[in-house]
Structure formats: structure tokens, C-alpha cells
């Protein structure tokens, strides 16, 4: 288990392009939410699900649910809600549409957090991924609140406002399943591709 880290699954998206709640989609016999919760449970004993539409999620009874503080405020609102509900020093925040994340990925991110205020991976395409990242509750909660009150909706703005350790994909590429870590499942076509990969993972 990782010390001083609480895990959060963001399940509050509207899933308009998918047409159904992504956290309830099944892959390899488990919902996306169950898959992510299983990997998080290998590194932390405390897991919470953030979102306003979580009542029907099929997850272990020890997992708590917490609502958004700022309703309909997108991804930054979800990160803010996680930080608000976090009882540990760090929040490990994972979006529900990353079904191929692993506990080894989480351990790799956590291993470099010392002296930083956030840890965020860089995808293979060079784009930072704020929705599979570690946030130190102080100062990130305070800054997230300030950003939201200024009208900001993108969590990348939070990462750019604190001391962030950017983890290059080359630092993660040797981990098993690394090529799929950040496969974002947004559409039925994405889900079809993920289902094919799911039989391999």
C-alpha cells in the first residue's frame, strides 16, 4: 500500500458521445469502475467515487461516494471534489474512462512525488494527462477553488499552477500494458477497440 494516498474515480461525466454512463460499461467481465477500483485497491485501502450519478454503480461496499461540490463544472470540478473529500495528504485521481490503468502505473507515479505538489504523466502523443494524476491536497485544493471561481474548467490549469512532476511516457513505457494506459474511451468506436484489447489484458 502507498502511504498518505487516497484513490478517487471520477464518474461524473455526461458521456454524451458514448450515449451511456462509461463507468458502467463492461470490459472483460467487469465494469470500467470495477476495473479501476481493483487496481486502486492494490495501492490504497481508501477509494471514493466522485460524481452525481453514482447510485447504480456496482462497486464493492467499502467504496464511498462523494458528490461534486461545483455541479456540472467538468473535469476540474471533479478534481476539486476529490480534493475536497480527501482525508489523506495526496489524492490519486483517475477518470472512469481509463479502463487499462494498473497498480504499477500508480506506484510509478507515486514514487516520484516527493518535493512536488502534483505528479502527472505525459502520454505517448506528448499530451499531459491530468485525469490520471496525483495531487497534494494542500495547495491543490485551494488553487482549484480559486481557478473555478475565476471561470476555469480545465484541470491542466491546476497542474500548471503548482510544482508538478511531469512523468515522460518513456519513464512508463516498460511497464506492462503501458501502450493502453491512456486509451480514453469516449465513443462506441473507442469501446469496440477497447473490447478487443480487453481480451488481451
Give the predicted meaning of each segment.
Residues 2-152, 160-179, 192-199:
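Nucleotide and nucleotide-moiety/phosphate-recognizing core
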Residues 159, 187:
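A residue-level signal for conserved active-site and pocket-lining positions in enzyme catalytic cores
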Amino acid at each position: 500500500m502507498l502511504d498518505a494516498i487516497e484513490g478517487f474515480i471520477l464518474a461524473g461525466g455526461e458521456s454524451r458521445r458514448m450515449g451511456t454512463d462509461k463507468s458502467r460499461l463492461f470490459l472483460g467481465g467487469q465494469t470500467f469502475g470495477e476495473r479501476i477500483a481493483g487496481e486502486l485497491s492494490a495501492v490504497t485501502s481508501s477509494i471514493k467515487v466522485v460524481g452525481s450519478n453514482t447510485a447504480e454503480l456496482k462497486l464493492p461496499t467499502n467504496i464511498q461516494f462523494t458528490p461534486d461540490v461545483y455541479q456540472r463544472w467538468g473535469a476540474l470540478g471533479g478534481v476539486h471534489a476529490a480534493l475536497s473529500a480527501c482525508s489523506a495528504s495526496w489524492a490519486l485521481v483517475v477518470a472512469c474512462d481509463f479502463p487499462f490503468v494498473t497498480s504499477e502505473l500508480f506506484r510509478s507515479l507515486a514514487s516520484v512525488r516527493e518535493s512536488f505538489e502534483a505528479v502527472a504523466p505525459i502520454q505517448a502523443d506528448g499530451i499531459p494527462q491530468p485525469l490520471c494524476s496525483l495531487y497534494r491536497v494542500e495547495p491543490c485544493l485551494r488553487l482549484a477553488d480559486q481557478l473555478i471561481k475565476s471561470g476555469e474548467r480545465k484541470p491542466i490549469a491546476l497542474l500548471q499552477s503548482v510544482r508538478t512532476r511531469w512523468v515522460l511516457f518513456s519513464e512508463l513505457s516498460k511497464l506492462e500494458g503501458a501502450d493502453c494506459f491512456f486509451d480514453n474511451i469516449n465513443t462506441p468506436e473507442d469501446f469496440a477497440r477497447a473490447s478487443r484489447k480487453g481480451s488481451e489484458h
